[in-house]
Amino acid sequence: MDAATLTYDTLRFAEFEDFPETSEPVWILGRKYSIFTEKDEILSDVASRLWFTYRRNFPAIGGTGPTSDTGWGCMLRCGQMIFAQALVCRHLGRDWRWTQRKRQPDSYFSVLNAFLDRKDSYYSIHQIAQMGVGEGKSIGQWYGPNTVAQVLKKLAVFDTWSSLAVHIAMDNTVVMEEIRRLCRASLPCAGAAALSMESERHCNGLPAGAEVTNRPLAWRPLVLLIPLRLGLTDINEAYVETLKHCFMMPQSLGVIGGKPNSAHYFIGYVGEELIYLDPHTTQPAVELTDSCFIPDESFHCQHPPCRMGIGELDPSIAVGFFCKTEEDFNDWCQQVKKLSQLGGALPMFELVEQQPSHLACQDVLNLSLDSSDVERLERFFDSEDEDFEILSL
């Protein structure tokens, strides 16, 4: 059966390969586990990640566009997953765990609400597909890791509840000075704050925007996305150990990538295998109940996660990290510097204090949107307007 057309029921009851019996540790987004003594903890950690897959029968994108993303939306779903992990860390903490049929905090439903397949959800498939037009991608066209990262950065401006500083490190270079300036800056756009308040929807007893505040933060939580190419057609073996160490960092958000035209969200590794969540199954779109409750079981992977050999990974990836505080960022920088001391391993990217002279700095802090942009986004978020325009920011 084609993986792209699997149903959720098929997925739940199919045979899944269990973890190998090995003494090697299992690493999941900065957490270390033993397969012999902590198997339940591993599965609980995996099940607590938000799992976004293909969906069908959602409202048409653009009013007349696709009602399913089967066959083209896998990288968009992976982008949602890595960004959702950032929001979970931001609002719930890395140690939060989801349990079936157990009441969850209101902030959990606010996070989930931001990714529902509706055009007025901040990071919905509708928003990503429409905003991707500005990155040169037609609706229904397959994305690469860099494109989805750029789109999510633009959409995050309007999520004033989370107040994230999103930085995409280009040219394999992370500039610490740029990130500190970005994270110490106040909210970038008053129009975005107003738009956020207008687009709130009360679900699960809490507005989707939850307590939006204009109080400046000393450090806006950082989402750092680093698009990389780790080889020409196959991953260079010299990067493998460095890639593994990225999953060991407590700031890890994982990796988006996969195989050509088949994206996955990688959350860890065991031995020489990567552990990932697979978006290639089609589930019905989730609709809010009359009481605005979100049925959430299909957003959690309740079976052993998929695995693939590291050597099978396509070399085009994006690595993600989340630093809630400046101390988290400083700690991350120290860990990255230690990676350069790994014998026989190549660093995947360069960490520098200031922008190298040979790299042009283009609008690192230019996150604000002009008035015409805000007007287009207001139209985009207006649930009464079924014929809104495609955005190009």
Curated annotation (Swiss-Prot):
InterPro entries, A to Z: ATG4_LIR, Papain-like_cys_pep_sf, Peptidase_C54, Peptidase_C54_cat
Active site per UniProt: C74, D278, H280
N-acetylmethionine: residues carrying this PTM: M1
Localization annotation: Cytoplasm; Cytoplasm, Cytosol; Cytoplasmic vesicle, Autophagosome; Endoplasmic reticulum
Positions bearing S-nitrosocysteine: C189, C292, C301
Substrates-to-products reaction catalysed: [protein]-C-terminal L-amino acid-glycyl-phosphatidylethanolamide + H2O = [protein]-C-terminal L-amino acid-glycine + a 1,2-diacyl-sn-glycero-3-phosphoethanolamine; [protein]-C-terminal L-amino acid-glycyl-phosphatidylserine + H2O = [protein]-C-terminal L-amino acid-glycine + a 1,2-diacyl-sn-glycero-3-phospho-L-serine
Name the UniProt record assigns to this protein: Cysteine protease ATG4B
Annotated source species: Rattus norvegicus
Taxonomic placement: Eukaryota, Metazoa, Chordata, Craniata, Vertebrata
Gene: Atg4b
